[in-house]
A protein has these predicted regions:
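Vicinal oxygen chelate
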Residues: 12-16, 67-118, 123
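Short, charged/polar, Gly/Pro-enriched secondary-structure boundary elements
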Residues: 49-53, 116-119
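Short acidic/glycine-enriched loop/turn segments that link adjacent beta-strands
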Residues: 37-41, 62-63, 103-107
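Core segments of cupin and vicinal oxygen chelate
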Residues: 9-52
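N-terminal beta-strand motif that seeds the catalytic metal site of vicinal oxygen chelate
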Residues: 1-19, 67-71, 123-140
């Protein structure tokens, strides 16, 4: 069996500045970077199984990224997921990360990186809210 592993790319103006943001404000680590003449042009940041690539290689794509990041919480309850996201919000705010509320038909915690790329963390849906649509899952 082969497992797939995705690493989305966020296009940024300055990889070194973005590394400082993701490491110092968002709590990621950086296992590697590609440099030329002492300047990083591509790097990876990781946090708890979430890996992102930062690159300055396509200027026309800078700041146009949007990534959904889900937290797998044990036990897998609505209350535990909400508590985990509230704890993440508190951690990020303590590190002066730009955290705001958002919505995608449900509540989001939104973080904008220095270039305007967005990280969306979804809160569990409220079973008491009335949705205008419904989720349809294809049969496997």
């Amino acid at each position: 069996m082969t497992n797939w592993f995705a690493r989305p790319v966020l296009h940024v103006t300055d990889v070194d500045a973005s590394l400082r943001f993701f490491v110092n404000r968002l709590g990621f680590t950086s296992p590697w970077r590609y440099q030329q003449d002492g300047k990083a042009h591509v790097a990876q940041v990781d946090r708890q199984g979430c890996a992102l690539i930062l690159a300055d290689t396509w200027p026309e794509k800078i700041g146009k990224g949007l990534i959904f990041i889900s937290l797998n919480v044990e036990p897998a309850t609505r209350e535990a997921a909400t508590a985990a996201l509230d704890a993440l919000r508190a951690e990020l705010q303590a590190n002066d990360a730009p955290v705001k509320e958002g919505s995608w038909g449900y509540r989001l915690l939104v973080v904008d990186d220095p270039d305007g790329n967005q990280l969306f963390f979804n809160y569990p849906s409220d079973p008491n809210e009335t949705a205008s649509g419904n989720m349809v899952r294809d049969e496997a």
